């Protein structure tokens, strides 16, 4: 089992926080996202970690090489990170991906340790980690049946508030078997890029595959586990509260500006 981390994006919405560093170099409560993620991955005793770099890639590579000497880490460079999207970053890592069972994840995530452990211990060989829709969630959604089969990927453009009861958010963590990668995912990934270009999302390939074979990819709900995706400054602030101690969480929320309604699972009665 290996891991592939997609870390080529520019993180424009974070403004000055990513002016000279990629998103995974951000600190949440004093710990960089990439340090937290690598610690969690190495705790699983994976054979290697493949990191696709792009924006400020040299800084990220130098930081990792300096702080993780001797660790089985491989770098792949996306030189056109400003003109492509994550589908191309994953395509660049296709040769590594074809060699082993793979955990695929994005570098702007923060999550508790049990999230990855649940993926590895799940008996299903090909799974997408999901979380029941909440109003703070954005991006790709899925619909599942009673047997946890993913029956549809719903891109952001097709999102409907009337359907939110049936939506689950993709956590952007996947576990794929080598067989699935070689026989299904990579051939369709290559065909999709040839047909629609490199400025797309890798989830679109999964959407096509679920249309063809709805039993190929299972959903794994991570109910009750903490996770967050950091796309902007508000996300960063929320992540800092989620992954703080109860005492520190209260202080951070009380010292913030604006209504408490922005924070997940927190009721704000000031408008009542």
What are the language-model segments listed below?
Residues 112-192:
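Conserved core of the sugar-phosphate nucleotidyltransferase
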Residues 20-35:
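Short catalytic helix/loop segments, enriched in acidic residues and glycine
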Residues 247-272:
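N-terminal "arm"/small-domain region of PLP-dependent enzymes with the aminotransferase-like
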Residues 168, 217-225:
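Catalytic beta-strand/loop signature of glycosyltransferases that borders the donor
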Residues 1-19:
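N-terminal nucleotide-binding beta1-loop-alpha1 segment
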Residues 207-220:
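Catalytic donor-sugar/metal-binding loop of nucleotide-sugar-dependent glycosyltransferases
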Residues 65, 70-141:
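Conserved beta-loop-beta/alpha segment of the NTase-like Rossmann-fold superfamily
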Residues 2-5, 31-100:
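Conserved N-terminal catalytic core of the sugar/cofactor nucleotidyltransferase
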